[in-house]
């Protein structure tokens, strides 16, 4: 049993609304190095903790956590479409273990996933199908949210399960860091928006294009005076990464959801995927972790970070 971890920000605006060439080159180099490390590790299983952005999960039934035994990418923005190579039998075994660990997790036998899951998988492996994968989606954009303590405990259960496997396992956490894209809230939404948030599966190409155009338009003004959304918060991002790197996972239990939203943006809660990933890593034993990269990138509406960890 050998376990490695990569936690990365994702951004659908990468390649669509890029910052300066020097910053793009920095990120490309960091991702190329991370991908080479994954290839050298040659995982026999990837467990990916990811959010959804109202592409697969909606308020008609919004689980805090869901594990997929089969998953297809919707191909939003510039991501690949098609099925992921989900290990169905192992996913079911993991789901049972999580439930036996007193963590209520939903199970999907036909889950649609978006860039929140697939972009990092593509960046790290070049494919949706190269390695067996188990996707675990953590609600990070559709309030109300459960406490971060529950996310940590989910990660611990996953980590205890994979520690029993005689496999090379890569844990991916994808999301955050500080950011607030134009994701609508159900509270106060008009009828059309509310209907989409409740049951907006399989939108028309025109609807998806219009939605993506709004995100692009926001990226073009994000961080400027005319943008009313919460700006990026590099200090918050750095403190969060440092906490995980130092292994102080118990501190996330005190995280206040509203305070995080106000300080770093409503979609910052995608860092729940990082919390779960590091909790899974810690459950397998002591680890060494380091920060590979960080830069606040307004054009991508993201505090963009990359962190890696391996067993001691």
Curated annotation (Swiss-Prot):
Q: Return the CDD domains for the record.
A: MhpB_like (cd07365)
One Gene Ontology term of the molecular function aspect: ferrous iron binding
Q: What residues form the catalytic site here?
A: 115 (proton donor), 179 (proton acceptor)
GO biological process: any one?
3-phenylpropionate catabolic process
Name the catalysed reactions.
Answer: 3-(2,3-dihydroxyphenyl)propanoate + O2 = (2Z,4E)-2-hydroxy-6-oxonona-2,4-dienedioate + H(+); (2E)-3-(2,3-dihydroxyphenyl)prop-2-enoate + O2 = (2Z,4E,7E)-2-hydroxy-6-oxonona-2,4,7-trienedioate + H(+)
Which regions span the lipid bilayer?
none
List keywords of the entry alphabetically: Aromatic hydrocarbons catabolism, Dioxygenase, Iron, Oxidoreductase
Cofactors needed by this protein, per the record, are: Fe(2+)
What pathway does this protein act in? Aromatic compound metabolism; 3-phenylpropanoate degradation
Q: What is its EC number?
A: 1.13.11.16
Disulfide bridge positions per record: none
**Record InterPro entries:** DHPP/DHXA_dioxygenase, Xdiol_dOase_suB
Give the record's family classification: Belongs to the LigB/MhpB extradiol dioxygenase family.
Subunit composition? Homotetramer.
The task this protein performs is described as: Catalyzes the non-heme iron(II)-dependent oxidative cleavage of 2,3-dihydroxyphenylpropionic acid and 2,3-dihydroxicinnamic acid into 2-hydroxy-6-ketononadienedioate and 2-hydroxy-6-ketononatrienedioate, respectively.
Q: What is this protein called?
A: 2,3-dihydroxyphenylpropionate/2,3-dihydroxicinnamic acid 1,2-dioxygenase 1
What gene does this protein come from? mhpB1
């Amino acid at each position: 049993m050998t376990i490695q971890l990569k936690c990365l920000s994702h951004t659908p605006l990468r390649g669509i609304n890029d910052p300066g060439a020097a910053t793009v080159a920095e990120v490309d180099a960091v991702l190329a190095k991370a991908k080479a490390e994954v290839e050298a590790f040659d995982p026999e299983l990837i467990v990916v903790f990811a959010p959804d952005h109202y592409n697969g999960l909606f308020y008609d039934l919004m689980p805090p956590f869901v594990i997929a035994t089969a998953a297809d990418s919707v191909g939003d923005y510039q991501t690949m479409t098609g099925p992921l190579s989900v290990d169905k039998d192992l996913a079911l075994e993991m789901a049972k273990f999580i439930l036996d660990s007193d963590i209520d997790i939903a199970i999907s036998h036909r889950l649609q996933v978006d860039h929140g899951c697939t972009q990092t998988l593509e960046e790290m492996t070049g494919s949706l199908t190269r390695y067996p994968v188990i996707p675990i989606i953590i609600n990070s954009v559709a309030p109300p949210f459960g406490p971060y303590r529950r996310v940590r405990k989910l990660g611990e259960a996953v980590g205890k399960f994979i520690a029993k496997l005689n496999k090379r396992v890569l844990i991916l956490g994808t999301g955050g860091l500080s950011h607030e894209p134009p994701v609508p809230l159900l509270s106060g939404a008009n009828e059309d928006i509310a209907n989409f948030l409740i049951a907006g599966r399989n939108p028309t190409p025109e609807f998806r294009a219009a939605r993506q155009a709004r995100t692009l338009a926001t990226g073009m003004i994000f961080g400027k005076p005319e943008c009313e959304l919460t700006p990026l918060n590099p200090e918050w991002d750095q403190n969060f990464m440092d906490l995980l790197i130092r292994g102080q996972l118990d501190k996330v239990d005190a995280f206040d959801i509203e305070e995080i939203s106000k300080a770093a943006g409503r979609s910052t809660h995608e860092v729940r995927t990082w919390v779960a990933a590091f909790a899974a890593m810690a459950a397998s034993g002591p680890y060494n972790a380091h920060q590979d990269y960080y830069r606040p990138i307004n054009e991508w509406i993201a505090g963009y970070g990359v962190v890696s960890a391996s067993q001691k």
